[in-house]
Amino acid sequence: MLENPRSPRVRAVAKLTKRSARTETGLFLLEGPQSVREALTYRPEAIVELFATPGGWERHPDIRAKAADADVRVEYVTEDVLHAMADTVTPQGLVSVVRQTPTSVRDIFDAAPRLVAICEEVRDPGNLGTIIRAADAAGADAVVLTGRTVDPYNPKVVRATTGSLFHLPVSVGGELPDVIDRAHAAGLRILAADVKGDDLLAARAEGVLAEPTAWLFGNEARGLEDDALELADRVLRLPIFGRAESLNLATAASVCLYESAFAQRAAPAG
């Protein structure tokens, strides 16, 4: 059992809360039973280390079974050690070190996707995590991150995805013009979400949302820059029926992705 919260090994795990350490090692940190469960289910080969308090391990027999099936060995730690490793105040008894497995932009669009979320300059970890989770729930084929979008392996992003990070391909570090070119070459229409756009309801009525689509979402404060908007085939806005000034980015992105998911599933086949 690991008992010293100041040991070099514990410090190495704790450093993964910092982007520099994640970039250097190609690893990231998972905390809590839900994230660990999804990693064991969908990417067990990416798990490098799994740590648990005895009580945390005992509380989750399904995780114990998945770890055994995947031949992933758990190392017991004290509560003090777990807190020293984790980014959260209450890591719920489980922490894992996992290998990053980003997908290339080329591979994403070579797979002939029908629904993709492109995030340009999205900076808030909670927003990005929620967009990844919403894309997963809506049946999107991938999420592509461009510009200075926050690191998807940031602990706050990882927590906000609640495991969806392991369910669909995520591409990191692409340049927007190249991503748009590849999306067009794959037959996708680029729809940009922006308050300056046309009403989304009109696009729905025209059948636009039933087509293979890459939604483009911008920065929380500034939205999409003019040069990014010019790359889109169409710019759409969500109508506001009540008195709210606007929706936050993650909520708006969720609505847009689900609108496309509904339309694509309602469209006649072939």
Describe the role of every protein-language-model region.
Residues 1-89, 187:
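N-terminal positively charged helical leader segments and presequences
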Residues 19-20, 109-117, 231-240:
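Glycine/charged-rich beta-loop-alpha catalytic/anionic-binding loops adjacent to active sites
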Residues 26, 119-123, 237-245:
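Short pre-catalytic strand/loop immediately N-terminal to key active-site residues, enriched for Gly-Thr
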Residues 32, 123-131, 247-252:
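Amphipathic alpha-helical repeat scaffolds
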Residues 69, 80, 98-197:
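RNA substrate-binding interface of SAM-dependent RNA methyltransferases
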Residues 96, 134-138, 152-165, 226-270:
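Structured adenosyl-cofactor binding patch, chiefly the S-adenosyl-L-methionine
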Residues 191-244:
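Active-site/ligand-binding-proximal alpha/beta "capping" segment
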